């Protein structure tokens, strides 16, 4: 029998018979590893323990201690277990697909009756029975005709369609436990008992179209979440409760920040309070960019398709563009324009105006660019996913030798901005060269090394996401962590030698010859709309004083105090504090409750005692005690608190 060489993570290699499975490899190392093993990585591919290995390879055996692999398998197996439970409870239900998603999985079903909360409880109960039965998971490769015949015989039209869509040169893998079988690429655990029975929960039912196409049949999608332990599940469910309390859509109504309506789907109607947050954040970012050497520009929102064709976006992104057709005077045909979905091609046009020298580089062009992208109605979510948004976008034109220093400076800027906004921790992911790419390996080596050196230079931790870079260059993604532990990908840094080439960007080098600059795409917030949504939820509406739309309400206790209330408001406004008066004929406790719901950080209560002493009674949001302060003292303190950082 032919032999193959398998190399382990410690660099040691061993000879094995060709066709050996990872399960057999694990057992050959130790009996305990054979029992603990759940899957393997073979040449970087997540591999089922039952799959044979036919050639030399690098191998790593995974156990439940390997978080990423364990969760993927648990959630994937639960998708199959749930589908089986549904069909055992309601045999007429047709199954479709059930992928792993963030924190869990979903499965789409074709059923005439709507799934109810009681149905979800019954499904969960049956799932736990399947898990506790500890049935072996088996897999086989089938011929296409056999798979089609199998599903046609069982009346599963969606599975027939899936099999028919698989390229003829690809094998068709089947998995089953008990008597229930499903089409699946795998991998899976080795028996149902490896799934924690107390660490999952079915969450909700939603409508979904087959293959995401509204022209197709509408299905029912059941979502579930799963973790390795019961405590992790409880922590996640608690986080969801907290997230519901912090929902920016609910707080947006209470604080009178914004609204959305069906006449302009995915477009934000900013109210005065919300627009104040937006403008303050924009002023802050403008100041930080100015300090960092960026030059602010403004480019058109409606741009002819010719530019999008030249940049390559028309071919790759047309379906997500808003197209505007115009009948130009004396023109033979309509002019086709698009609302810009991104700013980068327009920034190259600004760069291309006038001859550039190496002495002009790096050139940092920033824009608070208004963009529009078509998002399906089902994917939109408050401020978090919209069709019209503004990016804190910038592009750095530089030489290859300047990439490292520009990247390091950007990471330091991003870190400082996040801290100012209340986010002390973030993660960096470096996405490296994909299999299909342009450029030489030498060029990729240089830019990937430049990014890694930049990260190390600023002392940041990072992880590598192999093969997930764009076809033209590597990128960094920055994920911040909010107050309840959720991670949000906001910042990006993308190296791009491609767009300058497509759009003819050049500079005269020190050698007197023409060269192509590198273009570095970068953003810190991502979009203002989404980031404001994140801020609202992170702070549960209790924004930092400098960012709060209504910073101070000066409330009268008696009407005789109204003139002094007006004086206090005027003194605060003169020092840049956003202050307003509340002299309504209402009790002070009513006013305090109302403004607390509106998340006003500071309420100054004024009665005749304060008038006579020229003082104020200070109540801060979330506190029950009050503090008496002199007028000059409180104005100085609040004016200092109101200053925009940086």
UniProtKB/Swiss-Prot annotation:
The keyword Ligase applies. SUPFAM superfamilies: Class II aaRS ABD-related, Class II aaRS and biotin synthetases, TGS-like, ThrRS/AlaRS common domain. Keywords: Aminoacyl-tRNA synthetase, ATP-binding, Cytoplasm, Ligase, Metal-binding, Nucleotide-binding, Protein biosynthesis, RNA-binding, tRNA-binding, Zinc. Its EC number is 6.1.1.3. One of its GO terms (cellular component) is cytoplasm. It is found in: Cytoplasm. Its cofactor is Zn(2+). Residues 1-63 form the TGS domain. The keyword ATP-binding applies. InterPro entries: aa-tRNA-synt_IIb, aa-tRNA-synth_II, aa-tRNA-synth_II/BPL/LPL, Anticodon-bd, Anticodon-bd_dom_sf, Beta-grasp_dom_sf, TGS, TGS-like. CDD domains: TGS_ThrRS (cd01667), ThrRS_anticodon (cd00860), ThrRS_core (cd00771). It comes from the Bacteria. Its main location: cytoplasm. PANTHER family: THREONINE--TRNA LIGASE, CHLOROPLASTIC_MITOCHONDRIAL 2 (PTHR11451:SF44), THREONINE-TRNA LIGASE (PTHR11451). Homodimer. This is Threonine--tRNA ligase. It comes from Cereibacter sphaeroides (strain ATCC 17023 / DSM 158 / JCM 6121 / CCUG 31486 / LMG 2827 / NBRC 12203 / NCIMB 8253 / ATH 2.4.1.) (Rhodobacter sphaeroides). The lineage of its organism: Bacteria, Pseudomonadati, Pseudomonadota, Alphaproteobacteria, Rhodobacterales. The gene is thrS.
């Amino acid at each position: 029998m032919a032999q193959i060489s398998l190399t382990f993570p410690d660099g040691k290699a061993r000879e094995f018979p060709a066709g050996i499975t990872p399960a057999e490899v694990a057992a050959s190392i130790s009996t305990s590893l054979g029992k603990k093993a759940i899957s393997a990585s073979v040449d970087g591919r997540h591999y089922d323990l039952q799959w044979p290995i036919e050639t030399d390879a690098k191998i790593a055996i995974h156990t439940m201690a390997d978080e990423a692999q364990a969760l993927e398998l648990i959630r994937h197996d639960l998708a199959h277990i749930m589908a089986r439970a549904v069909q055992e409870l309601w045999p007429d239900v047709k199954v479709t697909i059930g992928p792993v998603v963030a924190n869990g999985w979903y499965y789409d079903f074709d059923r005439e009756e709507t799934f109810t909360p009681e149905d979800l409880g019954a499904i969960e109960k049956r799932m736990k029975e399947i898990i506790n039965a500890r049935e072996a998971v088996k897999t086989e490769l089938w011929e296409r005709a056999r798979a089609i015949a199998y599903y046609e015989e069982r009346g599963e039209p969606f599975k027939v369609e899936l099999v028919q869509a698989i390229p003829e040169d690809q094998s068709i893998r089947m998995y089953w436990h008990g008597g229930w079988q499903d089409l699946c690429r795998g991998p899976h655990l080795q028996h149902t008992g490896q799934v924690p029975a107390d660490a999952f929960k079915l969450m909700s039912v939603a409508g979904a179209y087959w293959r995401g196409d509204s022209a197709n049949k509408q299905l029912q999608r059941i979502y579930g979440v799963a973790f390795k332990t019961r405590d992790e599940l409880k922590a996640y469910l608690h986080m969801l409760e907290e997230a519901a309390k912090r929902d920016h859509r609910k707080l947006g109504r209470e604080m009178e920040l914004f609204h959305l309506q069906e006449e302009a789907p995915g477009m934000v109607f900013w109210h005065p309070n919300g627009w104040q947050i937006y403008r303050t954040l924009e002023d802050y970012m403008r100041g930080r960019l100015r300090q960092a050497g960026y030059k602010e520009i403004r480019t058109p929102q409606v741009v002819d398709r010719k530019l999008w064709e030249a940049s390559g976006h028309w071919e790759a992104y047309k379906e997500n563009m808003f197209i505007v057709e115009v009948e130009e005077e004396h023109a033979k045909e309509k002019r086709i324009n698009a609302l810009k979905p991104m700013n980068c091609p327009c920034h190259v046009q600004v760069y291309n105006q006038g001859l550039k020298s190496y002495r002009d580089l790096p050139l940092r062009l920033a824009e608070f660019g208004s963009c529009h992208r078509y998002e399906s109605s089902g994917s939109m979510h408050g401020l978090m996913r919209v069709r019209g948004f503004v990016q804190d976008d910038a592009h750095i034109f530089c030489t290859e030798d300047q990439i490292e220093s520009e990247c390091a400076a950007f990471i330091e800027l991003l870190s400082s901005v996040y801290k100012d906004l209340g986010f002390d921790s973030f993660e960096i992911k470096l996405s490296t060269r994909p299999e299909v790419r342009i450029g030489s390996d030498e060029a990729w080596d240089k830019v990937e090394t430049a990014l890694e050196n930049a990260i190390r230079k600023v002392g940041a931790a990072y992880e590598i996401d192999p093969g997930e870079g764009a076809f033209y260059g590597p990128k960094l993604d920055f994920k911040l962590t909010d107050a309840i532990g959720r991670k949000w990908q906001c910042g990006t840094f993308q190296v791009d030698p491609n767009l300058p080439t497509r759009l003819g960007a050049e500079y005269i080098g020190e050698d007197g010859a023409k060269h192509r600059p590198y273009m570095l795409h970068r953003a810190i917030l991502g979009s203002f709309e989404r980031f404001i949504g994140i801020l609202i939820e992170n702070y549960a509406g209790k924004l930092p004083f400098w960012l709060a739309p209504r910073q101070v309400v000066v409330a009268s206790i008696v009407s005789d105090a109204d003139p002094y209330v007006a004086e206090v408001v005027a003194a605060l406004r003169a020092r840049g504090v956003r202050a307003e008066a509340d002299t309504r004929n209402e009790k002070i406790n009513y006013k305090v409750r109302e403004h607390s719901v509106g998340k006003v950080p500071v309420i100054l209560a004024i009665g005749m005692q304060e008038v006579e002493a020229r003082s104020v009674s200070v109540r801060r949001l979330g506190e029950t005690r009050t503090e008496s302060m002199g007028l000059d003292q409180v104005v100085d303190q609040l004016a200092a608190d109101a200053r925009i950082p940086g």
